[in-house]
């Protein structure tokens, strides 16, 4: 497995990864069910402005040389690169293998290198895996009846 920035030519890998998402994974990442991912969405997710956003993918090449995207972490900053929001999604076949934690640690390091001073994230209240990731890294977590709001000063 390699971790690397996403590229425009990763659109087919992103589309294929999306097909591995259960309804639960879709709801946790997008706060709704998407159905089929559109070409416009794929463009938005693979052709990014690296001055304000970064997306790191986990790519695996199997024994038959087929590449797969296992997951992606995104960091989107404000125009001043002071505060940024991050999100993680991992394809269902690769849940429970520590990839979310690897992504979280990596994106926090990248945020620090960029001089970002605050990281935020919003997740649904039943996304206990992400809540655990936040707690383990020292995020302040607040909630309402539907969402967890996490913040970390870097």
Stretches found by the model and what they are:
Residues 1-154:
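Long, contiguous binding/interaction regions
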């Amino acid at each position: 497995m390699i971790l690397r920035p996403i590229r425009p030519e990763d659109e087919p890998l992103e589309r294929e990864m999306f097909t591995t998402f259960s309804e639960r994974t879709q709801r946790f990442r997008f706060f709704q069910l998407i159905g089929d991912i559109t070409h416009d969405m794929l463009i938005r997710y693979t052709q990014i402005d690296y001055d304000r956003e970064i997306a790191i993918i986990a790519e695996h090449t199997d024994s038959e040389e087929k590449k797969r995207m296992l997951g992606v972490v995104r960091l989107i900053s404000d125009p001043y690169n002071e505060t940024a929001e991050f999100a993680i999604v991992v394809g269902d076949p690769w849940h429970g293998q520590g990839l979310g934690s690897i992504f979280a640690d990596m994106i926090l390091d990248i945020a620090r290198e960029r001089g970002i001073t605050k990281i935020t994230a919003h997740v649904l209240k039943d996304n206990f895996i992400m809540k655990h990731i936040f707690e383990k890294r020292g995020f302040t977590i607040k909630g309402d009846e539907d969402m967890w709001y996490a913040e970390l000063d870097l």
